[in-house]
């Protein structure tokens, strides 16, 4: 029998159930459930598409208790109402001829409090996971441990009633069952902890109740599997002999298979790194005759027949397949037919492959996505040597190109290279090669280096394309032509480009900076919109009229009423526009000046800017929209009173003319142009700015030269919470999450949720001219941005208010009195001191306690060029300049005398898509 035949032959489990082959789809979290853990139709179709040729599908982990979900969008089996939805998954899989097994789990101390309504996670002991930002769990009482076992039993019963052929007990990945067995997380002194036998009681009890439910509600064919992580890195922690001890006990009680949870089938020890022996070989050598009767399953890195064959040869009986089943729904049929597969996903095929939007954005899936739109791109094959600069070093990059793809990227030897440097280079190299485009996300912690490498690849591609054109007899000096030219690659520019492309226009994006993202990438709070479906799901009652009135009030009634009305009316559609393109802003908070939770942000509560730009860039790449970086627009060319083209200059000092019928200027404001700021606001001389260095007002000057009018140029906003050493903006969502502001004496001094101008003025009026944002662990847990501030060293933390006050040099008694007074206001939902009416969410009483020193900085310029409600640029006589459109901070009039936090992101998407629509409409006739 050949190896291929071995893989595809039926396999009988110890309980007599026959699997049609040895191949299983591994359980992989998709984050595609509804907010309440119920099943979506998209998830049903995802599993239906992957059933059939593969013998068995293990459905992603289901939480058995509403304290147990470890992921946003997780699906649950914690109540009987979930049975109907799960039954749809089971039926979809079984109808195609595959077995359906459901994995059940509880996250324990790995649960983020924000996923369970801000409640404290539970665990065997009150010991936080050894990772940055981990929440402190509450230890389960003895009675609660018994109750938790019963909940696992109820989960098994529901899985049976939903029609599943079996369950897999998730005893791996540091979740609750593993936590009970680990001496790191279980330091109890009762019958559930202490000795290895006591620590094994919980996983064995879960197996026992699973058998009990199977006997009561299922037949003998019901499959019971157990997944385990063979080792832990922590000290103390689970070692391989501990694992073998537990597995022997599980086998003695009866289990139909055991499932290694490792990243690669032949992974060696992560504890004894000097020993290269694969753990599966150790397992086979150490197991008893009883354990040898239990089939063992391997997972990790299986793409082709040879990979599965290697696993069988080393001792696995069954092979679970992960990413390959995502990339190829019919994976088993393909390898049965002898296909050799490459692990990539065509960026245009998400819908065809039935990959849910949340799963599409997972890093492991994103790494497989390849931009197939470059099929039309043609290069002159060869190696191009590019010299670029990151923040600290000059880098020499060798870029090898073939006719239609990027073949390789090499970093020339340099004495400045470190292990960290070369590691991050390899990561960005892999992203670019996999995506076949330089427009990929930078590596976290290595942004400057990543952008330099991306720039080198982009320059090489441009040179190669020009060389090929010259070789084929093309005239490189001849003007290029696009329907729409977008100037600026922040959120407004990218949104305009995507919209114009989707309406049939050919589009060029021109960006003067070396990187995509503009100032949007620094946005933190979120995106305001009223009457959205995400508000309705959360039961938030809101109205567009209230949004309009609060924005008008916040802008001191200086807003252009027509533009503001268009802004408010189009905001919900803008949220949906993003969602339709895979950018989900479905977590909701509030910002200063708003009385309702309407600030939409990413599901995990992280800063909106990077998430938004990453999603928009994926859409740009997917569509094959041309982008020129390090290129400035020197002049907008006119033919009579109409736009006819642009004159560009790149970083090689080449002058390029591009013909176009429509131009969208989305270059941002002028906060980084200190001379321009001081011209209109002399009182702001010396203030730092939160903006990136490209925010110089160049687009305003460009449009003024063709006759554009301007408005509100003296309306410049300072943001109250800026870290002064780095000019880093501290998100308004921290205050919106329940933080307070205190002065150096430890006292509150103003309503933290007032508009930015008023809060800034109050801080400036303090003798010290700075303040502290103070918050506790509850606020930190619900705001992912806070973890970033901690990592950057902005945060002073302490275990108690007294310790925090001492570290900040403030009077402890005054600080404690401040906290007591504020916590009383939260309890009464009434702030007698300063009239705060919003974001009185929870008392500040959960340690550790945190503080960030802040002061105001120049943040937003409300003034800019004049436009009408169609995004057309108006001249000094308020007449449209034909073919000229503008969006984002380059525009004046929308925000009046003060911009509300969360309105800028709404502005760029609303007016960016509007400008893109109108520009394409004009260009296409």
UniProtKB/Swiss-Prot annotation:
Binding sites annotated in the UniProt record for FAD: 492, 511, 519-520, 525-526, 633, 860, 889, 904-905
Q: Which cofactor does it need?
A: FAD; FMN
Give the domain of life.
Answer: Bacteria
Q: How is it modified after translation?
A: Is flavinylated on Thr-447 by ApbE2, encoded in a neighboring gene. Flavinylation is essential for catalytic activity.
Enzyme class, spelled out: oxidoreductase
Just give the chief location class: cytoplasm
Entry-linked InterPro entries = Aldolase_TIM (IPR013785), FAD-dep_OxRdtase_2_FAD-bd (IPR003953), FAD-oxidoreductase_2 (IPR050315), FAD/NAD-bd_sf (IPR036188), Flavocytochrome_c (IPR010960), FMN-bd (IPR007329), OxRdtase_FMN_N (IPR001155), Succ_DH/fumarate_Rdtase_cat_sf (IPR027477)
| GO terms, molecular function | FMN binding; fumarate reductase (NADH) activity
Entry keyword Cell inner membrane = no
| Induction context | Induced under anaerobic conditions in the presence of fumarate or malate, but not tartrate. Is repressed under aerobic conditions.
Describe the reaction catalysed, as an equation.
succinate + NAD(+) = fumarate + NADH + H(+)
Keywords of this entry: Cytoplasm, FAD, Flavoprotein, FMN, Oxidoreductase, Phosphoprotein
Q: Which residues carry this modification: FMN phosphoryl threonine?
A: 447
What's said on domains?
Consists of three domains. The first domain of FRD (Oxidored_FMN, PF00724) carries a non-covalently bound FMN and is used for NADH oxidation. The second, FMN_bind domain (PF04205) contains a covalently bound FMN, that acts as an electron carrier between the two other domains of FRD. The C-terminal FAD_binding_2 domain contains a non-covalently bound FAD and forms a site for fumarate reduction.
What the record says about family reads: Belongs to the FAD-dependent oxidoreductase 2 family. FRD/SDH subfamily.
Protein purpose: Catalyzes the anaerobic reduction of fumarate to succinate. Uses NADH as the inherent electron donor in this process. Is involved in anaerobic fumarate respiration in K.pneumoniae.
Descriptive protein name: NADH:fumarate oxidoreductase
Organism listed in the record: Klebsiella pneumoniae (strain 342)
